C-alpha cells in the first residue's frame, strides 16, 4: 500500500488550478489543461474584456472557446483511484483538514467569521460578501502576531528563569547561612556544656572537700567535747559525793578539792575553725569564672549569629607587584622581586597592599587573617573605601579612607591619624576583623585569646573593601574561615 506522503503527492498532481481542490468531473480545454467542470463553467461566466467567442486559459492564457471543453474520463478514473488510496491510507484516522459539513478539503479562511471553508462553503451566500483568503495567505498575519507573542513570551520566560535561578541561588545562600548558624549554635553549646560539666565537677569536688573537712572537724570537736564532759562529770560526782559526807568527812581535804574546782579551766572547743568557715564563706567566689564564661558565651553566640562570615578572596587586579598570590587567591607572600603585572588603574604601585575581590555596602561581616611574619616584617589588616588612592604615596589613616592595624615584629599599632602602639598581652598571630557598616565599627580581635585589639568608629557612605598589606621577605598571610572568635564590641 502506498504511504501517506506518496498518496498526498499524487493528489497534488490532480488538483484543479482554479479551486486548488481535487478535480471534480475533470474537463480538458484546447490547450490541454484540466479543470473542474463547475469551476471552468463559473470562470466562463465571469464578465471580462474577452469576447464571448474566445476566453484565455487561467494557467497559460491560451485562447479557448467556451463550449469547446470536453470530459476527461481517463483523468476522472485516476482521480477516483487516488481518492480510494487516500481513503485507505487514512482509514481509522480522523481527517482533520476535511470540512465537517461537506467532506471537502478545506482551502479557505473567512476573516469576518474566522471560519475555515471548503470550496462548497465559499460558494454559499453566507460568506459571499466576506473577505475569504487561502489558508496560507490568511495564516501569514497571524503567524506574524504569533512571532511577536513568542518574542515577548520567550523574553518573559527568560526573565522568570533568571529570577528563578537568582532566587534559588539566594535560597541556597540562606540555607548555607542557616546551616552555618546551626553548626555555630551546636558548637557553642557543646563548648558551654563541656565547660559547665568541668565547672560542676570542680565545684562539687570543692564542696566534697568542704564536706569532708567539716565532718573531720566535727569528729575532732565531738572527741574534745566528750573528754571535757567526762572530766566535768568526774569532778561533779566527786563534789556530790563529798557533799553527802558528814562534816568531818566533808572538811577532810576540802581545801585541795575546792582548789581543783576553782583552778579548773573550762575549754570550749569550736566546732568549725575560722579558716574552714572562711573557706565556706568564700565558696561563692568560685562561681565567678562561671559567670564570666556565661557572659563570654552569650557575647560569642550573639556575635556569631549576628555577623555573617565573609568568604573573601584576594583581587589580583589590585595586588602590588611585590605580593605573590596563591592560585586560590587566599594567601599572599612578600617578595622583593617585582612580578610582571600590568599597571592597571586598580593596582597599588607604591604601598604593598591588595584588596579583597568583593566589598560591602551594608550589614555585619567578619573574616579571619592568619599572620606569619619574618624578622623585621609587618602585616596590615583593615578596610578601605572603594575610591582609595592606588597610585603614588599613600598614608594609611582614616583621612585617606583607610581603617587598619599594623602587626609588626614585636608590636601592634592602630593606624589612626597618628599611629598608636597598643599594649597587648600577646602578639596576635590570628586576627579577626569585624565590620558593622551601619553602626560604623571596625573591630580587631586576637582570634586565639579573644583579646580586643582595637575598634575604629567611622561613617560609611561608599562600598568598603577588606585591605591587606605586607612587608618583609618571608612574611605572609592567609585568609581562613571563621572559627568562632568573639569581638568585644
Curated annotation (Swiss-Prot):
UniProt note on tissues of expression: Expressed in embryonic liver.
Domain B30.2/SPRY: residue ranges: 292-486
GO terms (BP aspect): erythrocyte differentiation; host-mediated suppression of symbiont invasion; innate immune response
Annotated Zn(2+) binding sites: 99, 102, 121, 127
Coiled-coil stretches noted in the UniProt entry, renumbered to this chain: 144-180
Location (main, coarse): cytoplasm
Gene ablation phenotype (knockout): Deletion mice inhibit hypertrophic remodeling after transverse aortic constriction surgery.
Cellular localisation: Cytoplasm
Residue ranges covered by zinc fingers (RING-type): 16-61
Any one GO molecular function term: zinc ion binding
Keyword Metal-binding applies: yes
Keywords assigned: Coiled coil, Cytoplasm, Metal-binding, Zinc, Zinc-finger
A Pfam family matched in the record: zf-B_box
Zinc finger (B box-type) residue numbers: 94-135
Gene Ontology terms: cellular component: cytoplasm
Biological role stated in the UniProt entry: E3 ligase that plays an essential role in the differentiation and survival of terminal erythroid cells. May directly bind to PTEN and promote its ubiquitination, resulting in its proteasomal degradation and activation of hypertrophic signaling. In addition, plays a role in immune response regulation by repressing the phosphorylation of STAT1 and STAT2 in the interferon/JAK/STAT signaling pathway independent of its E3 ligase activity. Mechanistically, interacts with the intracellular domain of IFNAR1 and thereby inhibits the association between TYK2 and IFNAR1.
Family: Belongs to the TRIM/RBCC family.
PANTHER family cross-referenced by the UniProt entry: E3 UBIQUITIN-PROTEIN LIGASE TRIM
Subunit structure: Interacts with IFNAR1; this interaction prevents association of IFNAR1 with TYK2.
Protein name: Tripartite motif-containing protein 10
Gene, per the UniProt record: Trim10
